[in-house]
Amino acid sequence: MNYQDNSLKSLKLGQKTEYASQYDRTLLQPVPRALNRDGLGITQNQPFTIGADIWTAYEISWLNEKGLPQVAIADIYLDYQSQNLIESKSFKLYLNSFNQSKFTDFNAVQQTMQRDLSECAQGDVKVRLNPVAVYDAQKINHLQGDCIDEQDIEITSYEFNANWLKDCVSNEIVEEKLVSHLLKSNCLITNQPDWGTDQAQQAILTARNNKLNFETQRKTAEQTLRNLLNLKPNEALNITFPHIMNVKTAGVNLNVPVSVIANRPDVKAAQFRLSSAFKNAKATQKSWFPEVNLGASLSSTASTVGTALHNPVAAGTVGISLPFLNWNTVKWNVKISEADYETARLNYEQRITTALNNVDTNYFAFTQAQSTLSNLQQTHSYNQRITQYYRNRYNAGVSELREWLVAANTEKSSQLAILNAKYQVLQSENAVYSSMAGYYL
C-alpha cells in the first residue's frame, strides 16, 4: 500500500494540537479509500453491494440556547461508496469543538454533523444522536451471519494479497453473510492497530451476470431487427426503446370468428390435405365452410373463439366434431378410399382442437400474468411504505440502519419483479395472438 501519499502529509495525527473552543468544521480531515483499495484492485468495482463504516461516539456534548450542557451518544454510518474515510484524530477534535457551542436542539446538532461529515467523506453519511437514557436498557447484540473466527485453519501470511479476491469474479453465484470479530487495521501514520467487528454480506455476481445476460439478449434482438431491415453493423438502427412499463398492451379480443385459426400453418396444411381428397373442392366448399366461416361449421354452437373455449370439455381439451365432412355426406365427391379420407378428416379435426386448446392455454397464461402484475404492484406499494417507515424510525433514532437497508433492498427487489411481470404480460399476450395466427380488431 502507498502510505506515503501526499494526502497524508497534512494530517494532524501524531502531532501536538490545540483543542478548539468553538465548533469548527475545518478540523475534519479526509483519507482517500483508494489508498487501500487500489492495491486490492477494487477501487472501481467493489466485490460487495452494501456496507458501511459504523462509528459510535460516546462523548458528544454541546450547549443549548440557555448555555446548559447537553450530552448524547452518536451512531455514525459512513457509506462504503464514499470517496474518503475520516481520519480518527481529526474526527475527535471536530466532535470536541461542539462542547462550548450553542445549538437549538438535538436535530440541529445531528443535521450539522451529517452535513459536515458528508462533505468531508464525499459520500453518504448518516448521523443519529441518542439520549443517554436510551442506553439504560440497551443490549449488546450479536451480528447476524456465520462467524468465521473459529475455523480450524492454518494461516502463514498476514499481508495484503489481491489474489485472495479472485473468486469474486468466478462464474459461480454465491450468497452468504459472514461475521468476524478479528478485523484489524493499522493506522496509516502511527501503525497502531485498531480492532473491530466486520460483517460482510455478499451477493457475488448475481446482478452482474443478469445484466450481462440481458445485454446479450438485447444484442440478439437487435441482430434480428437489423436482418429484417437489411442494416449493416455500422449503420444506425434508429429505434427508440420505451420503458417497458410505458408499453401498452393491445388487449386480447376473443370475440372473433373461430375461422381465424384457419390462418395457422398447421391448420392450413391439414385443410389442404383434406381438400385434396375431393374431386371438386368448390362443390363442397359451401357446406364445408359456410360463409367461409369455420366457426359456423363446428358441431359446437360456438361462433367465436371466446364462446368456443367455454364449451364442455373432456380431459381438459375442447372436443370438435365436423358432421358435414362425414363420409356418407361427401363420398360422392371423394376420389380416395374411405380409410384415407377418414385419416385426413380426423387429422383436420385434431388440428382444429389443438389450435383452440392452444388459444385457451395462452389466454389463461395471459390473465394469470395480468393478475401477477397487479399483485406485485400492490406489494411494491406496501414495500415503499415499509421502507419509508423504517427510514423515519432511523431518523428518529429508534431503529437501526440495517433495518432500513433491508427494507430498501426488499423494495428494490419488488420493483425488479414488476418489470419481469410486465414482460411476462407482453409475452403471453403475443402468444395468444400467435396461436390465433394474428391480431384481429
Curated annotation (Swiss-Prot):
It holds the Pfam family QueF_N. One of its GO terms (molecular function) is efflux transmembrane transporter activity. GO terms for cellular component: membrane. One of its GO terms (biological process) is transmembrane transport. It comes from the Bacteria. Belongs to the outer membrane factor (OMF) (TC 1.B.17) family. This is Uncharacterized protein HI_1340. It comes from Haemophilus influenzae (strain ATCC 51907 / DSM 11121 / KW20 / Rd). The lineage of its organism: Bacteria, Pseudomonadati, Pseudomonadota, Gammaproteobacteria, Pasteurellales.
